[in-house]
């Protein structure tokens, strides 16, 4: 059982006054609880109370009582909680310690001093339960996002913890990977485990969650049975800043036929994966959804066209101008999927204009404009790493807007974002399109595609198998691809 009583917590050097404010919640053994709410509302912080990362890892001011299976977590070390609470983070790479899948799965058991015979027994059982046979012996860095998430779940399961905490586990997963994760979570529930899932994508937990807890500005504003929660319409969920189902009816937009970029045919290979791209003609000002399952070649395509893959001979033609190699970076800008890799400054305000050749006055005015637009002005003096995942995403996008490149690539720009922030991203993408900027949006988010994308590229196994504008046939095909998000 989990008993949280009158808990308030604020992070050291926090952006807001308090991450949690007088929160109380009792969760019986075997219950599956969905924690939802807008970015920065306190969902992730609540999970950190349960798994002991607060106060063992995150410093701050904590008051109240936190009891997990009869133990006061504030009096325990993390290793003492490891057998009771298992955690799966938004980015599974952050919890990997070894190079190979096999050693990663057994790593936690080895660290507890478990007997070899018992480790092997559990390993065999876990591989069968999670259907991991084809992933054994592989380098974890070469796995897709969904495969990494499966290995993380398997590794956590090896210690057989009665409680599991998942922090936005689907934010970087495609539809097929989400289906597999749902199967894993269903197995945990069937064995009587207590499961807490902090999530923005809600649809995949329909029929699994027993209870829904809604956070707002650090407080619990709703605690309802799941059946009651699912009776709400998409519009009612959106009004609370929550994600709903998507009918997937993207808007058709016409572009001038004489104003376009030509992407010359190119090929890129790393020895194991090959990307083959035909000639593409992209209207200027278009917003192109780049779709397909994890590992299909979408991110490689974007990196090649931004000049980030050294051996790739990608080329973009703009009238009489040709951009190739390093020159591509003068035309194209990329917002990475893991935004931590592109946040370098000591303050949010400085990060927006980092690397731009502007005067100090121009930097200040540009940063102010972009931070107001992305509703980050109140965080301007904070360190970027002190922001929530959703706020970091918006900061990286603010940097893309400030750079004023003619072509912008977004790699999962709404990963970790709630409905309102997703709408804000879509609005800014549409605004840039009206300014003539051409944008490519790598995404698994049908709501984002519906709100801002007017063309698409669909990738399978390193090839573009479908592309163009939103014809009735294309919409029907991709509605089928996204159909799981409407279930």
What are these regions (language model features)?
Residues 219-241, 463-486:
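Conserved beta-strand-loop-alpha-helix hinge in the C-terminal portion
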Residues 174, 418:
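ABC-family nucleotide-binding domains
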């Amino acid at each position: 059982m989990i008993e949280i009583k009158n808990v308030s917590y604020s992070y050291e050097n926090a952006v807001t006054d308090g991450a949690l404010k007088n929160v109380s919640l009792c969760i019986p053994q075997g219950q599956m609880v969905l924690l939802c709410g807008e970015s920065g509302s306190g969902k992730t912080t609540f999970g950190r109370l349960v798994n002991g990362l607060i106060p063992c890892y995150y410093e701050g001011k904590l008051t109240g009582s936190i009891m997990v299976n009869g133990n006061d977590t504030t009096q325990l070390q993390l290793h003492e909680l490891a057998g009771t609470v298992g955690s799966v983070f938004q980015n599974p790479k952050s919890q990997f310690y070894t190079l190979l899948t096999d050693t990663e799965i057994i790593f936690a058991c080895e660290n507890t001093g478990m007997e070899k015979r018992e480790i092997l027994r559990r390993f065999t059982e876990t591989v069968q339960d999670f259907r991991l046979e084809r992933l054994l012996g592989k380098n974890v860095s070469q796995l897709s996002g969904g495969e990494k998430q499966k290995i993380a779940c398997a590794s956590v399961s090896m210690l057989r913890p009665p409680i599991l905490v998942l922090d936005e586990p689907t934010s970087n997963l495609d539809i097929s990977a989400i289906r597999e994760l749902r199967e894993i979570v269903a197995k945990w529930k069937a064995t009587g485990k207590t499961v807490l899932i902090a999530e923005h994508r809600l649809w995949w937990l329909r029929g699994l969650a027993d209870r829904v807890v809604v956070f707002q500005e650090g407080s619990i504003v709703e605690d309802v049975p799941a059946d009651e929660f699912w009776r709400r319409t998409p519009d009612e969920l959106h009004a609370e800043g929550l994600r709903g189902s998507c009918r997937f009816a993207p808007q058709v937009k016409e572009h001038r036929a004489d104003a376009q970029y030509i992407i010359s045919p190119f090929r890129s290979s790393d020895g194991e994966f090959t990307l083959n791209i035909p000639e593409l003609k992209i209207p200027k000002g278009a917003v192109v959804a780049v779709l397909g399952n994890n590992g299909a070649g979408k991110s490689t395509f974007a990196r090649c066209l931004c000049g980030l893959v050294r051996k790739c001979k990608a080329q973009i033609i703009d009238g009489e101008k040709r951009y190739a190699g390093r020159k591509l970076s003068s035309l194209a800008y990329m917002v990475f999927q893991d935004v931590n890799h592109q946040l370098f400054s000591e303050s949010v305000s400085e990060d927006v204009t980092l690397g731009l050749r502007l005067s100090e006055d121009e930097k200040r005015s540009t940063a102010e404009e972009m931070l107001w637009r992305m509703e980050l002005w109140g965080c301007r003096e904070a360190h970027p790493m002190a922001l929530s995942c959703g706020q970091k995403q918006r900061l990286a996008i603010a940097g893309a807007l400030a750079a004023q490149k003619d072509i912008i690539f977004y790699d999962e720009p709404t990963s970790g974002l709630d409905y309102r922030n997703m709408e804000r991203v879509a609005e800014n993408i549409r605004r840039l399109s009206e300014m003539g900027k051409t944008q490519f949006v790598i995404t698994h988010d049908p709501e984002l595609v519906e709100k801002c994308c007017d063309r698409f590229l669909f990738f399978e196994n390193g090839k573009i198998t479908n592309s163009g504008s939103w014809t009735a046939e294309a919409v029907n095909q991709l509605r089928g691809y996204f159909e799981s998000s409407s279930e």
